[in-house]
């Protein structure tokens, strides 16, 4: 039975709380579980549950968990839920010795009453068949006819109270008793009729089980409105947001775009009639969002804001259980576009992981080095491989790599600047040529011999204007004032 307690601790206790409350639990259990600082930082919920099972073999630490949750205001309801689950397991343990005695009583009843009491139509038919088999025995032994009649009446009376008992049991568990049908009706009819409303009730309960009281929270951020395809194959619009109270933060799926004007950064709002799963809220058409009054304002602690902005490490995501919802900003390493899906490989210093985008997340314009901000992606594990899968409400926001863009633009502009440099100096390079052609210049001068030497070392240098610009960079400015300088350019 300790395993049943551990299931409650892990699946209904640790799994549904957020990271902040989980850190509180680890801190409170550090002495009992002998957790060092590194273990408190790195151990996940599964590892803590294993240690709790070893330390508290009786109830796997469920009692401790209930005590902690009672002290946290936002986890009071969860503490009551865990308390009820613990009582259920305790009742099962107490009923084990009783079950060992019941079979002997049943065997005695079977000896006295051939028809076993039951509510199902198949058992009713069995009881009827048992009565029919008693018929020949009655004819063979007339002396026992009255006794057989009494027994058949007693068996019928036994079946009726058992049905009413079953009905009361189902009513106590929150379900209406199944409809009673005659023995002539087919067995499948009653079973299908009773199962359909039961399934509908379970589906309704699963939708409404996460309803919470109104909360007052500050808006930290909100995305733009985007399109998504509903389960009815209809194009609808929504947006994501992040809000925070004084004790924790929540990711919000807002399915009513008319509420977009309410979700303004740093605004205090009141959200009511919403649904909640772990630290994820869903606001729809039936929800209500209003601005808080002046007396309801508060400041969100910096630690909460820092944790809301914290990006999960990829190696930590690999350790999470399948179904874990992921939000975060990751670097794109590669992108593979298929016909219906796109594989985005994200990477950080701790590892890499594949992100499968489909629907609105398929083939989004991005390239290596860009950052992908993922909203509401679900972790899936198969054959020791972890992937982030896009779902109906998933969204990808692209942050372009501005550093790479600016570097590329500078590298592209550099050749253009070099090609444009000779243009403003063309006048200075052509002017010496015109002065060299003037009749005032003697045919043979020392400067001409110097140019001849220049040509010998660098053939074709005289025909290149750039060569003149390099050898006599200061020739052009004094043209208007000193012509002698132009006639005899300085040779370096």
Swiss-Prot record:
Residues 106-199, 400-492 are annotated as: Disordered. Pfam families: HIN, PYRIN. Residues 181-194 have a biased composition (Low complexity). GO terms for cellular component: cytosol; nuclear speck; nucleolus; nucleoplasm; protein-containing complex. GO terms for molecular function: double-stranded DNA binding; ubiquitin protein ligase binding. SUPFAM superfamilies: HIN-2000 domain-like (SSF159141). Residues 142-159 have a biased composition (Basic and acidic residues). The keyword Nucleus applies. Induction: By IFN-alphas and IFNG/IFN-gamma in hematopoietic cancer cells. Keywords: Cell cycle, Nucleus, Tumor suppressor. Residues 199-399 form the HIN-200 domain. One of its GO terms (biological process) is activation of innate immune response. Residues 1-88 form the Pyrin domain. Expressed in spleen, lymph node and peripheral blood leukocytes, and at lower levels in thymus, bone marrow and fetal liver. Down-regulated in breast tumors. Residues 160-173, 416-432, 460-492 have a biased composition (Polar residues). The keyword Nucleus applies. Major mediator of the tumor suppressor activity of IFN in breast cancer cells. Promotes ubiquitination and subsequent degradation of MDM2, which leads to p53/TP53 stabilization. Promotes ubiquitination and subsequent degradation of HDAC1, which in turn enhances maspin expression, and impairs invasive activity of cancer cells. The HIN-200 domain mediates interaction with MDM2. Belongs to the HIN-200 family. Interacts with MDM2. PANTHER family: INTERFERON-INDUCIBLE PROTEIN AIM2 FAMILY MEMBER, PYRIN AND HIN DOMAIN-CONTAINING PROTEIN 1. This is Pyrin and HIN domain-containing protein 1. It comes from Homo sapiens (Human).
């Amino acid at each position: 039975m300790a395993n049943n307690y551990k299931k409650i601790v892990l699946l209904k206790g640790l799994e549904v709380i957020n990271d902040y409350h989980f850190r509180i639990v680890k801190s409170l259990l550090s002495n009992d579980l002998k957790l060092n600082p590194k273990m408190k930082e790195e151990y996940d919920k599964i590892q803590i549950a294993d240690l709790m099972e070893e330390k508290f073999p009786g109830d796997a630490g469920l009692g401790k968990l209930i005590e902690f949750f009672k002290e946290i205001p936002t986890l009071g309801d969860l503490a009551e839920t865990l308390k009820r689950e613990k009582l259920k397991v305790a009742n099962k343990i107490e009923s084990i010795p009783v079950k060992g005695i019941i079979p002997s009583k049943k065997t005695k009843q079977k000896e006295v009453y051939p028809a076993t009491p039951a509510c199902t139509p198949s058992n009713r038919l069995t009881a009827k068949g048992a009565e029919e088999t008693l018929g020949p025995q009655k004819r063979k032994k007339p002396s026992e006819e009255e006794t057989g009649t009494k027994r058949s009446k007693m068996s019928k009376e036994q079946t009726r109270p058992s049905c009413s008992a079953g009905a009361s049991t189902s009513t106590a568990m929150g379900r209406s008793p199944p409809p009673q049908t005659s023995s002539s009706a087919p067995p499948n009819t009653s079973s299908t009729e009773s199962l359909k409303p039961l399934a509908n009730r379970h589906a309704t309960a699963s939708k409404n089980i996460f309803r919470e009281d109104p909360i007052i929270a500050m808006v930290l951020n909100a995305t733009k409105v985007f399109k998504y395809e509903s389960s009815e194959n209809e194009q609808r619009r929504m947006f994501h947001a992040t809000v925070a109270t004084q004790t924790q933060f929540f990711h919000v799926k807002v399915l009513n775009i008319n509420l977009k004007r309410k979700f303004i950064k740093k605004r205090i709002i009141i959200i009511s009639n919403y649904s909640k799963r772990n630290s994820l809220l869903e606001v729809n058409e039936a929800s209500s969002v209003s601005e808080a009054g002046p007396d309801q304002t508060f400041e969100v602690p910096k630690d909460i804001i820092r944790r809301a902005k914290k990006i999960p490490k990829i190696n930590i995501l690999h350790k999470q259980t399948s179904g874990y919802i992921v939000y975060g900003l990751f670097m794109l390493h590669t992108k593979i576009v298929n016909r219906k899906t796109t594989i985005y490989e994200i990477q950080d210093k701790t590892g890499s992981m594949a992100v499968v985008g489909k629907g609105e997340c398929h083939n989004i314009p991005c390239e290596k080095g860009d950052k992908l901000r993922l909203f509401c992606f679900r972790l899936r594990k198969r054959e020791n491989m972890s992937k982030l899968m896009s779902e109906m409400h998933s969204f990808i926001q692209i942050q372009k790599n501005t550093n790479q863009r600016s570097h590329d633009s500078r590298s592209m502009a550099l050749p253009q600047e070099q090609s444009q440099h000779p243009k403003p100096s063309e006048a200075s390079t052509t002017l010496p040529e015109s002065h060299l052609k003037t009749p005032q210049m003697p045919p043979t001068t020392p400067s001409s011999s110097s140019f001849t030497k220049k040509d010998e070392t660098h053939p074709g240098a005289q025909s290149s204007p750039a060569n003149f610009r390099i050898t006599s960079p200061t020739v052009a400015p004094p043209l208007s004032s000193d012509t002698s300088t132009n006639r005899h350019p300085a040779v370096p």
